[in-house]
Amino acid sequence: MFLAQEIIRKKRNGLALSPAEIQFFVQGITTNAVSEGQIAAFGMAVYFNDMNMDERIALTTAMRDSGTVLNWQSLGLNGPVIDKHSTGGVGDVISLMLGPMAAACGGYVPMISGRGLGHTGGTLDKFDAIPGYQTEPSSELFRKVVKEVGVAIIGQTGDLVPADKRFYSIRDNTATVESISLITASILSKKLACNLDALAMDVKVGSGAFMPTYEASEELARSITAVANGAGTKTTALLTDMNQVLASCAGNAVEVKEAIDFLTGAYRNPRLYEVTMGLCAEMLLLGGLASNETEARAKLNRVLDNGRAAEIFGKMVSGLGGPVDFVENYSKYLPQSQIIRPVFADAKGYAYSMDTRELGLAVVTLGGGRRKPGDALDYSVGLTQVCALGDKIDSSTPIAVIHAQSEAAFTEAENAVKKAIHIGETAPEKTPEIYAYIRAADL
């Protein structure tokens, strides 16, 4: 038996906590035996004094075990349970293609995703643009779709990781969100509660990323890789570029359209293709579905080219309540804005740099993102045909096309887009889509 205040005192004094002490405190978060003030004090003590790797693993597994841990044993799946998670960005539509692609290669992908907040879009918000799609199905339906289709992308259910829900809301209000130890536990407890065999982690870097610097992103990637592997889940983190919009668009319905165009081969943005393939190939390698990257990429290209991945996306949508002909007739179902109009730069030259965060916030001002949790969204609005860094820009080349519901909203977004995309006299140096892979062997 421990006292919460003694655990806080120990961490305040910079000492390491035992797994039993961490387990006790997390249990108290879940049962309300630990007060809000004590949780806030604990968060601040960790923020200033940090945790060693053993403490991080203990915190992550205690939070994972605070609620239901999914069990796939009874379903008799004939392949690995694999997933990916992203720290979030702008135009990050990867999950919509990656899930069906991995399933088409023999994996099972029970992806529990989140909603957008601030400048980053949320995977669930994109699916909410699809009429009838249930982002909060019963656990029976979730398991049925995972088994029969190979992938189901849904929202977090109430009985998964309740400790994180309470802890995170208090961290958000007490300025302790930025702790690497606490971020690691928050992200991984949710993913590990899905009982995965393998996880590919997408840690964004740049002006649209969650972490402020490359160094901070790398530190988070290393922490996640070490803790996840320490907790028994094979994990690799990729550091990927978010200094520009990842897809050619940002929003909800517009990103669903781009995902379907990608799966069917109608259009594949080269940057989006590279990051999607990198993450998906890593999932296949970790899950034992390919023996090297060349083989993994060949398998993924095959399921894209033969239509299998697109077919699986369609089956997932219909299995979770969406239209059966969604892939073939998506334009019939996706909402469309009143105003769809290009925006032009005031100067000519090259797209030199982008404040990706500001472009994400432009989508929020259009009504496509949240200023606070619970805000209603307009799924039709957003940006399309966003230029890529290095593109030649002149008076006849739009830097983006804005989808808005009113002239006032269009004008506000137009000003934001012009401010966020900087035109230079020369093209910038090309940066890689994937900066680094951080595998267990690299730690």
Swiss-Prot record:
Pfam families noted in UniProt: Glycos_trans_3N, Glycos_transf_3, PYNP_C
GO cellular component, one term: cytosol
Catalytic activity: thymidine + phosphate = 2-deoxy-alpha-D-ribose 1-phosphate + thymine
Keywords: Glycosyltransferase, Transferase
InterPro entries: Glycosyl_Trfase_fam3, Glycosyl_Trfase_fam3_N_dom, Glycosyl_Trfase_fam3_N_dom_sf, Nuc_phospho_transferase, PYNP-like_C_sf, PYNP_C, Pyrmidine_PPas_bac/euk, Pyrmidine_PPase_CS
GO terms for biological process, alphabetical: pyrimidine nucleobase metabolic process; thymidine metabolic process
Keyword Zinc among UniProt keywords: no
Keyword check for Oxidoreductase: no
GO molecular function term, any single one: thymidine phosphorylase activity
Entry EC no(s): 2.4.2.4
Family as reported in the entry's similarity comment: Belongs to the thymidine/pyrimidine-nucleoside phosphorylase family.
Summary of subunit composition and partner proteins: Homodimer.
Protein role: The enzymes which catalyze the reversible phosphorolysis of pyrimidine nucleosides are involved in the degradation of these compounds and in their utilization as carbon and energy sources, or in the rescue of pyrimidine bases for nucleotide synthesis.
Name of the protein described by the UniProt record: Thymidine phosphorylase
Organism: Shewanella sp. (strain W3-18-1)
Gene name linked to the record: deoA
